Amino acid sequence: MASLLQDQLTTDQDLLLMQEGMPMRKVRSKSWKKLRYFRLQNDGMTVWHARQARGSAKPSFSISDVETIRNGHDSELLRSLAEELPLEQGFTIVFHGRRSNLDLMANSVEEAQIWMRGLQLLVDLVTSMDHQERLDQWLSDWFQRGDKNQDGKMSFQEVQRLLHLMNVEMDQEYAFSLFQAADTSQSGTLEGEEFVQFYKALTKRAEVQELFESFSADGQKLTLLEFLDFLQEEQKERDCTSELALELIDRYEPSDSGKLRHVLSMDGFLSYLCSKDGDIFNPACLPIYQDMTQPLNHYFICSSHNTYLVGDQLCGQSSVEGYIRALKRGCRCVEVDVWDGPSGEPVVYHGHTLTSRILFKDVVATVAQYAFQTSDYPVILSLETHCSWEQQQTMARHLTEILGEQLLSTTLDGVLPTQLPSPEELRRKILVKGKKLTLEEDLEYEEEEAEPELEESELALESQFETEPEPQEQNLQNKDKKKKSKPILCPALSSLVIYLKSVSFRSFTHSKEHYHFYEISSFSETKAKRLIKEAGNEFVQHNTWQLSRVYPSGLRTDSSNYNPQELWNAGCQMVAMNMQTAGLEMDICDGHFRQNGGCGYVLKPDFLRDIQSSFHPEKPISPFKAQTLLIQVISGQQLPKVDKTKEGSIVDPLVKVQIFGVRLDTARQETNYVENNGFNPYWGQTLCFRVLVPELAMLRFVVMDYDWKSRNDFIGQYTLPWTCMQQGYRHIHLLSKDGISLRPASIFVYICIQEGLEGDES
């Protein structure tokens, strides 16, 4: 079975040299630089390394895990070593998810270029593969792993070992019968196409075959009309035309004769079901499909907390990599904590902690470079400034000189605005959020309203500094603060704050009477949640005309996250997350912003944009129309083995479905577990949910490995907005804990949404 990459591997000069192997230094820090021998494996999909040229090698990384390749000049670590290592000989391998970058130093510029070109070629090839090509490559990878003696053939003993690796528990006699049927050459081994036939027999899906035959008159093919009937009746694509059905046949039918006859074979039908058209996520929601001309405060905005940190909040590393990763995943609001640094250069770090420091100008340069690589819509720099007057001037100079035309330094067209501009009007602009001087303030310093230093850095009990003082006590505190020696706000920096002036929140009434649409308040998660419970409707109305930013509790020193859904329910636009930390909360955030082109802006439902809205997230009442969701969890495909330390174990998978939305809609149900089958488990169970406010609901599908002795192990998940869900027979392609695709791992479900009557709290 020839690999899809075989042509390139045998003809491309760079790939040929990479297969021979080269020595390179692996760089982790200024003091850790080790010589290693790296070699591209013959499958073209994995790179191994060894301590010595002919020493025992082990896997270093898979090409499918690589996001991009950067040259040495773009590496924060390699730049710090520029005096001892030539940057032209270095390069960085950036991985998907949260895996640390791999910095390498070649022996020459030419060798570095060979690896950079070769790796980028392989990454581009993998990225451009369609479903069938990915499946073929996946099969090729498994064949390579199963063929222990690398002779291009697989004995039955090797096949048995491979089945175990693939999570298949199968009767030996049945496995041998499949093996013999595939061994058409009768050589006692499987080669190339014989292994493909063995795999097809192994993965024959009775549930899909049954579905296919229920719509096919002859059980062999679906005619154009039969396929159209399936799309309209089962897939609930009522507006589907025969032209669209024909387009799908042309796209997924593998045989030319089938395309000419306008029919879909069983293979074509399965290919359609496994494609993006058969995915649970509606393809119509993937591009930018929402109105982007409304004021900024009408959108949920993907936001990051302490963006510079790639670890915990007390001792973690500060790095520009945090900004690169946040911006490339579509984040549109990043945080910058700035303090006085040596030699007059401001630095960014988590004040009063042991976190490392990076230069403010490096952060600004990174934002300038990466701000609009993923999305053209505006980026907000949330400044927390703790600098002296002089270093504030330096900050203003860096922002102006480095960002140039990208920086919004005046109102649009110089006109006095009456509302916030829209994302469309602010395309490719960077906005500064921070404190701003006014004539009334007469250059007096106003205490930063958000993220009190005690809460963030000294970890006093949260309640001590999140309890709002009485007005009289507040005034005394403010006077006392002004007596202390504090840096005065520099006019040059103040003038760069155009639409996003930070102000202290006192009450919703006070905001209505004294504040303007271009001002923004920040809330700790605890305070925001309390306000939702005590005055949920007022909070919703507040967020229809002014922006709110919510940040994690200072007690989350491990960089854990809160559930953003609770804050979105009240219309809070900027719910800042610790993006370096994977988990349920980030799954919800990623799933929410997967829609609308992943541009980082999602239009809020109309009832969260109406200033007269009566909506209360804790008490949703009519006119919201409830919906009932029926999910038949049918089967799973090629689920990975999660805990490789459990020798000889095969997963016992179960599926958990979670709903996140308003409190009354939050629910979870799960299937039974299937014993010893991660390859093609079958559940056939139906779960039922009733949701009052579908516009705010998120669905999370989680596959777990059941363990009666301890906690179930996580296998994979997929999270999406209710409004982006397709009905009918759909595949859910699973993601890892880090959000990386686990293809071809998936679950097969049937989705049915029934409209309910007008719902209330009951």
From Swiss-Prot:
SMART domains named in the record: C2 (SM00239), EFh (SM00054), PH (SM00233), PLCXc (SM00148), PLCYc (SM00149)
Residue sites binding substrate per the record: 433, 435, 522, 549
Binding site for Ca(2+) 4: 650, 652, 676
Span of domain C2: 609-736
Region (Substrate binding): 26-53
Entry cofactors: Ca(2+)
Disulfide bonds: none
GO BP terms, alphabetized: acrosome reaction; intracellular signal transduction; lipid catabolic process; small GTPase-mediated signal transduction
Organism domain of life: Eukaryota
Motif PDZ-binding location, chain numbering: 731-734
Extent of motif GBA: 213-243
PROSITE patterns: C2, EF_HAND_1, EF_HAND_2, PH_DOMAIN, PIPLC_X_DOMAIN, PIPLC_Y_DOMAIN
Localization per Swiss-Prot or TrEMBL: Membrane; Nucleus; Cytoplasm; Endoplasmic reticulum
Sites where the protein binds Ca(2+) 1: 147, 149, 151, 153, 158
Protein known as: 1-phosphatidylinositol 4,5-bisphosphate phosphodiesterase delta-4
Organism: Homo sapiens (Human)
